Amino acid sequence: MTARKLPLTRLARHTQRQFLQMLLWKVEVYFPRFFSEYHTVKCLLKNPFFTPIDGNECWPCQDLKAIVDLSGHVDAAEDYTLSGTPFVVRDAVRSELSLELMQKILRGHQEILEDETSKYESTLEKVKSLRELISHWSSDHLKTNAYHIFWQTNSVAAARILRKTFPRPYFVPKNTEVSLERSFLIDGPQEPSYTLPQSDFANTLLVQVEGTRIITLDPSDYCSRNCSSISILMKPNDMLYYNNQISTPRSVPSRLTDAPSIAYMSSFY
């Protein structure tokens, strides 16, 4: 019995497929972080013609003069969340947050430090990794006036650990999906103004862990003709809700204290 011969085109495609599989396997073996960084990315290439909302949907920020405090008003907070109107509450965080608590969480869970899906950025030359951040937490490196550190995790293990300290707020509907993406922003007391990163889902929660910062909600490009900017001073344990399709948040130094600012960001659908 003679072996069946494949047509030349099919043979060429088969060879190309084998070569591509071998090439990708080599990349995965020698550059595992290349795949882990993009594994959880929902969109690698954005559509420049896509607009999530139009001007008619910007009514939650029209004529808004201030960010209202809805502490203790559960029903009102739920209504504001459904409409996308920004507000702040000061009774949603159950435990007293502090720099020491965050240090304890990071040191007590090795899996967070070994998470290859996390992102870490720092303007401090001596604090270029999460491990260096822990080791220099009380050193002079974090006593400078102006610096910015950004740490973002996107793993199930990290979300499970952080959920114990930052549980789902009472005004977030139980049938909503909470993103795995969690971010920390650490700023020196004189760190200049900067735009906060866009959260995974539109409904965004920002918790002030320690220190103070002024958060200015500028209207997004879609709502710039309908809305104006509003600001709020964030103090420890304050939780701010906003919709990132309606508002573009900026973090501004408050100049009220010499302590660094630590903020925690999450989002839900």
Regions found by a protein language model. Give the residues of each.
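N-terminal accessory scaffold of Fe(II)-dependent oxygenases
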Residues: 1-241, 245-269
